From Swiss-Prot:
This is Ribonuclease P protein component. Its EC number is 3.1.26.5. It holds the Pfam family Ribonuclease_P. InterPro entries: Ribosomal_Su5_D2-typ_SF, Ribsml_uS5_D2-typ_fold_subgr, RNase_P, RNase_P_CS. Keywords: Endonuclease, Hydrolase, Nuclease, RNA-binding, tRNA processing. Belongs to the RnpA family. The keyword Ribosomal protein does not apply.
Length: 121
């Protein structure tokens, strides 16, 4: 079985799950994304995505943004154990800006990891 699958268990699906991550308010943001984090007590990370109509009016664009974030999470989930993340898009990006947006997302997750490491030690 591949370690790079994005199973249902790795997704935040219910309103309560999203609310619990938002209530902790451990977050970092940049021009493209705002990422909220909360320890979940599981052996794997979970992710939830929020892309509003104010960010991207067309569903095609919103789905593209979510697809890009899901793909990044799928490929990098091994290093993100035991945390629930909610990724909120702040700005829509085009295919030409995808690499820049993914780099920005990587930087936010790295900042949150450093923050969690410093607060736990």
């Amino acid at each position: 079985m591949s370690a790079y699958r994005f199973r249902r268990a790795h997704r935040l699906l219910k309103t309560d799950e999203f609310s619990s991550v938002f209530s902790l308010r451990q977050q970092r943001s940049n021009a493209f994304f705002q990422v909220f984090a909360r320890p979940n007590g599981l052996d794997h990370a979970r992710v939830g995505l929020v892309v509003g109509k104010k960010v991207a009016k067309r569903a095609v664009r919103r789905n593209y943004i979510k697809r890009c974030v899901r793909e990044w999470f799928r490929l990098n989930q091994q290093g993100l154990d035991g945390v629930d993340y909610v990724v909120r898009a702040k700005t829509a990006f085009t295919r030409e800006q995808r690499a820049e947006a993914v780099t920005a997302l990587q930087a936010l997750f790295a900042k949150l990891a450093r923050c969690r490491a410093s607060s736990s030690s």
